[in-house]
């Protein structure tokens, strides 16, 4: 029996004062990053609301700018993403080394531009998390994948649908699933 099985379904807090007011819930970085990367796929501007202003989100914005995406913020944690140059296909190591989620641009670049040159992601405090499932999933869709000097070079004339299992010996990969789904 796990701890979750023994927890009550209702948690009641009895305090001395009645709570009143409003709480603004921030958006989730781990949801925002793959959505920002997926904006590469769009013909029209993409608006994402509730995107938290965090270092990783800023880094993703910098990666997208390198890939020809205009990134505009408003005062309400809304970001507008719009393709202004559909030619760049290279996501540089100097930015991807800062966060693993930058690797999420691989699938959208491949699907949209037919080619992607994306640096292998940098280190992680959690430990090694390989991208083999990302690459296997993209190969299942018809991509040609090469590893060259620390970069993944992916090409596809036309991706095709496939049944793919996005789990390996260490379990499923959320980022890999987002990457492959955005290419499909």
Task: Describe the residue ranges of each PLM region.
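Structural preference for solvent-exposed beta-strand-turn elements
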Residues: 1-184
């Amino acid at each position: 029996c796990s701890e979750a099985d023994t927890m009550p379904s209702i948690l009641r807090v009895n305090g001395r004062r009645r709570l009143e007011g409003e709480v603004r819930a921030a958006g989730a970085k781990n949801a925002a990053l793959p959505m920002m990367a997926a904006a590469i796929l769009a013909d029209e501007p993409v608006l994402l609301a509730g995107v938290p202003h965090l270092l990783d989100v800023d880094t993703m914005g910098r990666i997208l700018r390198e890939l020809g995406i205009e990134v505009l913020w408003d005062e309400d944690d809304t970001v507008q993403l719009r393709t202004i140059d559909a030619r760049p296909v290279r996501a540089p190591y100097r930015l991807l080394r800062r966060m693993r989620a930058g690797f999420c641009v691989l699938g959208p670049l491949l699907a949209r531009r037919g080619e992607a040159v994306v640096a292998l992601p940098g280190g992680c405090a959690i430990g090694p998390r390989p991208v083999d499932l990302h690459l296997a999933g993209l190969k299942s869709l018809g991509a040609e994948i090469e590893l060259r000097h620390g970069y993944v070079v992916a090409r596809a004339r036309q991706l095709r649908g496939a049944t793919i299992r996005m789990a390996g010996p260490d379990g499923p990969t959320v980022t890999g699933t987002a990457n492959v789904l955005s290419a499909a």
